[in-house]
């Protein structure tokens, strides 16, 4: 895989801003900026470009308020409200994660891209650590551009033009099973119906291709039998687990992490109970994912599933492809 050559540290246009890579495929640490204060346009533009190039930006030593966090998020777009997560009583845009009073956290995250059950998933997510456990509680990130580029040419061609259906399936367990709960869930289904996204998207800033399926919200690939779709998705999900494609962040208090939801997946490790972990989050609204290629038709699917006829001839057999297209 070709890796773009970048210097270990680059000076952004704002003279005091330094961006230092911390991972091969994603991740950079940003210094020389104080998020408790308003930022000028030059700094915002530099951070926006770094966000697209590195996928995950880490801002250490940022003792900021909730209002500071929201202001920082608004530099990059409108803040969205998560329909299922627990928001602050003071602001619907602010999500608070806190296992105070010894309450165990939920089970460890499934790898995912945030809120792909929306027609327009968020462009980015910003998380600020307030209280962190002494041990555990890391967050893992994976570059879905690196995952795509690591696939063989044949797999890349096959996936091109495919579409997958996404749904808010993990949140269905939040609804009670009584009549009132079922009615409430149906209202959410009307508001957030299953949506279709390209399996391979194009990042709107870098122009690089991205594998855009995830085990938390993706249901199936359109135009395939259930077992075929499941087999392909499970193979693609395993690619996310390749360590070289990942950046694993160990949290310190007062750290802000801003990741690109358009080409990065993440999973939080909930291995810190009974220690406390208090985090605040804002989410920056995005636009519909851009397809790398027009939707594929059935003939395209069959063509790439079968090996070329020359492979059979080279084996000295008259065997013919099942589908001669």
Show where each model-derived region lies:
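Non-heme Fe(II) oxygenase catalytic core, chiefly the N-lobe of the double-stranded beta-helix
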Residues: 2-253, 261-325
